[in-house]
């Protein structure tokens, strides 16, 4: 179908996108939104008022499948759409993994598009409106580069900037390489030019995205390094740079130096450990040891003593013994994470770990998980306590969900910051501004205090 025909069908139709999962999925949703906008569609605030409902999915954990099926089924009870006809589309990792198999679980989905087929979603939706049939596209070898598509940003001050897609690591528990494909880096200058343009538009903060940003550039001519990219993005004038995700085996000394020497790179690093047991790390195919990881943490803190480290940890991987878990617990106590995402192992069909039977009772795994959570809560609280009676610059994102008279912001260490809206200002005047907050309360997951000085 040609672009004019797609526009004729879609122009004026409303759409709603619900996103599950990681930051890459959030950016994928922004790309779908930007594509629909380019064909004259209008964003709706809820599915009830949408002609097009899109679910961007994650398949890292089993619960994501169940949640998707529930969301799709809930669309059956929605009132008629504004145009009188509604198309339900499912994209992302579950769509890529299951393809036509989704149709056996949900009977009201009209469009299925995989992680490599985002550039074709408008055409697929238009065809579904036109002929009422189901349309599926999950080609793993699409040659259209969707990383350069237009997108609809959720905010004017922050932007997700993909620098690469895919993963070559094939950790034994992880489905991501099978649904996102092999690593593909974006051209160096294209990324720098994009950030330069974003700065001109008023963007103050960017998050560089990739399944493993530390391996950026290995597939490009000249093999530019992630460290070089950090420095170049820092030279664009953007005020804040975050990035995710980092694989410990690929975090080189030159990258640590670039982080320490580039003022715009924020003092925060997400460094997924997954387990503190060398034996389990080997079973996971992580390709580093407990000692390697702890040595890396020491090198990072030697260059950036006050950096906020966050991580991912899985409890209950097949074969994990009590001793293995104690190793994980002691590593968490040693590193003193500022934040951690902790998970109970979720079997993913098609991964090597899914073939291993584990006799460990669920109640034992749950008890271990709860012990780990308590350690993380303790270290996170202790880290935040270090911010008491300091002044923290917070980029304001909106208001607290519990109190619209209280600002919600983010510190350079990715901490949530609350402060009452200062007298003489409205929230509209402050969103996207940086305010200094004198911290007088430090809880486990947030800081709070009072605004001092003028917003900037």
What are these regions (language model features)?
Residues 2, 355-456:
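Terminal RNA-binding accessory module
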Residues 85-92, 97, 200-325:
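Conserved SAM/AdoMet-binding glycine-rich loop
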Residues 154-157, 167-169, 265, 275, ...:
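Short flexible coil/turn linkers enriched for glycine and charged/polar residues
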Residues 320, 327, 335-337:
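Contiguous mid-protein beta-loop-alpha structural module that forms a pocket-lining wall or clamp
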């Amino acid at each position: 179908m040609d672009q004019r025909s797609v526009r004729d069908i879609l122009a004026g139709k409303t759409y709603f996108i619900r996103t599950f999962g990681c930051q890459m999925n959030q950016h994928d949703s922004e790309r779908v939104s930007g594509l629909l906008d380019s064909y004259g569609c209008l964003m709706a605030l809820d599915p009830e008022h949408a002609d097009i409902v899109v679910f961007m999915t994650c398949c890292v954990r089993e619960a994501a499948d169940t949640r998707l099926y529930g969301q799709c089924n809930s669309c059956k009870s929605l009132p008629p759409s504004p145009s009188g006809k509604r198309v339900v589309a499912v994209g992302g990792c579950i769509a890529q993994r299951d393809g036509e198999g989704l149709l056996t679980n949900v009977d009201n989905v009209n469009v299925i598009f995989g992680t490599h087929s985002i550039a074709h979603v408008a055409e697929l939706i238009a065809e579904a409106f036109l002929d009422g049939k189901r349309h599926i596209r999950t080609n793993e070898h699409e040659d259209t580069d969707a990383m350069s598509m237009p997108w609809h940003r959720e905010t004017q001050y922050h932007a997700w900037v993909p620098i690469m897609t895919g993963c070559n690591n094939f950790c034994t528990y992880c489905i991501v390489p099978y649904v996102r494909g092999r690593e593909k880096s974006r051209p160096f200058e294209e990324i720098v030019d994009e950030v330069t343009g974003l700065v001109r538009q008023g963007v103050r903060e960017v998050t560089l995205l990739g399944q493993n940003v530390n391996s950026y550039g290995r597939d490009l001519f000249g093999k530019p390094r992630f460290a070089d990219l950090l420095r170049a993005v820092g030279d664009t004038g953007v005020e804040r740079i975050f990035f995710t995700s980092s694989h410990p085996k690929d975090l080189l000394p030159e990258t640590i130096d670039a982080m320490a020497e580039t003022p715009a790179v924020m003092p925060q690093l997400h460094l997924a450990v997954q387990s503190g047991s060398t034996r389990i790390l080997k079973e996971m195919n992580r390709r580093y040891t407990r000692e390697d990881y702890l040595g890396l943490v020491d090198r990072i803190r030697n260059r950036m003593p006050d950096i906020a480290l966050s991580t991912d940890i899985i409890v209950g991987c097949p074969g994990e013994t009590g001793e293995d878990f104690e190793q994980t617990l002691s590593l968490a106590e040693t590193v003193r994470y500022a934040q951690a995402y902790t998970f109970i192992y979720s079997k993913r069909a098609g991964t090597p770990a899914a073939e291993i039977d584990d006799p460990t009772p669920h109640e034992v795994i749950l008890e271990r998980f709860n012990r780990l959570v308590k350690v993380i809560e303790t270290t996170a609280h202790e880290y935040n306590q270090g911010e008491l009676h300091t002044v923290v610059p917070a980029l304001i994102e909106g208001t607290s969900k519990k109190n619209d008279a209280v600002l919600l912001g983010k510190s350079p260490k990715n901490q949530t910051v609350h402060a009452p809206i200062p007298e003489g200002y409205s929230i509209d005047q402050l969103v996207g501004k940086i305010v200094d907050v004198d911290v007088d309360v430090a809880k486990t997951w947030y800081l709070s205090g009072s605004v001092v000085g003028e917003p900037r």
